[in-house]
């Protein structure tokens, strides 16, 4: 049976910045859906313990003042989010994350910062998964398409509504629906694969993409360029 009509969980973080090792969680969401229809949604607002830069607040709408007044300690949020993710993985439920290395690496960095067990440690040493990453899948199945590869652009291409971009719950659900749309558009490459097999294929796809990008950068811009292709976390 295809995973397209089964339970999936969309995951998204909104953060203080764009560097996973340094940025902090501001909001998080897990959206459970079956066949693309929402069954349950969980959301968190964290006090990241550092000021939220104005440019980040302008994107996701959470100011430092609001995070301090309404947010929970970021360590508690990170721990709860990690526990929930690992429960889904233990149950065999695929987690959909657009640009998974950002969100999963940032979550692991946040856990380490507060002396909490990593995702792998919570899974008995196993890597997180299965993960479905619409960004990695889209780059592989439509390799030569020009233009942006953001979640917003993917929604436009695959006919998914995204109301209120950069709100964690909205982005998580949109990513989940883009994954389903990709599976339907590319059944042999995506939709008909078992989620575990698709996870493994994405590891290869991301590695190949990184190698191609690194080669292009070295030829055209920087002979010493290095592109890290670790997926789903770096």
Task: List each model region and its residues.
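DEDD superfamily 3′-5′ metal-dependent exonuclease/proofreading module
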Residues: 1-26, 32-40, 69-234
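Short, surface-exposed acidic-centric catalytic microdomains
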Residues: 40-60
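Short glycine/proline- and acidic residue-enriched helix-loop micro-motifs
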Residues: 62-68
